[in-house]
Amino acid sequence: MKAQPKASHFIGGAFVEDKAGKPLPVIYPATGEEIASLYSATPGIIEAAYAAALKAQGEWAALKPVERGRILRRTAEILREKNRKLSKLETLDTGKALQETLVADAASAADALEFFGGIISGFNGEFVELGGSFAYTRREALGICVGIGAWNYPIQIAAWKSAPALAMGNAFIFKPSENTPLSALALAEAYKEAGLPDGLFNVVQGYGDVGAALVNHRLTAKVSLTGSVPTGRRIMAQAGEQLKHVTMELGGKSPLIVFDDADLESAIGGAMLGNFYSTGQVCSNGTRVFVHKNIRERFIERLVERTRKIRIGDPFDEATQMGPLISAAQRDKVLSYIKKGKAEGATLACGGGVPKLQGFDKGFFIEPTVFADVTDTMTIAREEIFGPVMSVLEFSDEDEVIARANDSEFGLAAGVFTADLSRGHHVIGQIKAGTCWINAYNLTPVEVPFGGYKQSGIGRENGIAALAHYSQIKTVYVEMGKVDSPY
């Protein structure tokens, strides 16, 4: 299988190549096969992207918001028309099951474009009456914004970041993860087809040095990152030297709390969704599953039964429920955590190994894994693994589990399963996390903000809040009388 794009980069409305850049091979995670060969951006490529963005941004910002929104909504239509093609590309790029990419990737990107394209014309400033005189505020674009993506949801992340930025009148430069560089180029083509003026959405490929060059560029007004906490700290420090706006959507070790009155099958389904979807490579996953002692034994029994039925295999078989991890390095990292979990005394309830799959022996597969008898101090309960590894912990009462759930440097997400909605609201109100669910998990509609507390991030993706993060406020005071001056 091959998925070679026309060129590595997309700048000023056209594909651009510069083979002087460092080679960037693209690997299909299910087989280890190279499916494309790209090149990292050179300084010349980076400068060309900024020149194109600078040329286009002012005129774009001057358009009526409804006109900008119309182009975004047309882009959403194009993505939906091409959903199967884009989903197959995303499966090649990430290894995720086609069953998943058909509903969770380009489809979510289209939702974001449609939402921001529709809401931008109503996102206005304020009028303040001041007793004859008055003031008003304007929401204005920041200028050139940079997005740095992750490899778990490439096209979704590219759209979640670029849609609100473009809606507000900014230009956008996006660097995908070096592991998954392909679908951002497809998004660029969709923008072009929809009529987005050249230079407003640019894609530059590369490794960490390219990301650093974008962050440090004098024309960068804002940086939006989806990535790990260490990467976020580094980028925020770089951006802080020039006081640039930042949005950080980082890692997590989120709690999922199951009370003894919860619907057992629903809670197990939520826990599986919050640990095994995308082969566990989701930042908001509820990897610390706290189960009340009264139902712990039955919960684990049914969880193991259902987990063992997960179908692992060919990502392009729509019956497949779980594909491989993104890379050999990520697989080895996850396996090392499983080894550490066993060494520290956790009980391996199921999984923990590498499945034998005919035709995919060089792929980066791993079995969905459940640990029982996990304690709060174990490494697998403290550190983000980013793989299909669930830790089940026992609790006795509400106050106890709230305290333990909050005992983490992270605060991205949390979930509660209970038949008592009053208790559900109370517990969620005490949890220090930015994105929470009651009797559900990992549902992220674009209409609501997504982001975390503590080390899990700053700012928000999606919802009206995202528009605020891609804009700046200008206050205008209008004096209707004469100036009252003591001079």
UniProtKB/Swiss-Prot annotation:
K(+) 1 binds at residues 27, 93. Belongs to the aldehyde dehydrogenase family. NCBIfam families: BADH (TIGR01804), PRK13252.1 (NF009725). Its cofactor is K(+). K(+) 2 binds at residues 243, 454, 457. Gene3D superfamilies: Aldehyde Dehydrogenase, Chain A, domain 1 (3.40.605.10), Aldehyde Dehydrogenase, Chain A, domain 2 (3.40.309.10). The active site is at residues 161, 249, 283, 461. It catalyses: betaine aldehyde + NAD(+) + H2O = glycine betaine + NADH + 2 H(+). It comes from the Bacteria. GO terms for molecular function: betaine-aldehyde dehydrogenase (NAD+) activity; metal ion binding. Involved in the biosynthesis of the osmoprotectant glycine betaine. Catalyzes the irreversible oxidation of betaine aldehyde to the corresponding acid. This is Betaine aldehyde dehydrogenase. PROSITE patterns: ALDEHYDE_DEHYDR_CYS (PS00070), ALDEHYDE_DEHYDR_GLU (PS00687). It comes from Brucella abortus (strain 2308). NAD(+) binds at residues 149-151, 175-178, 228-231, 251, 283, 384.
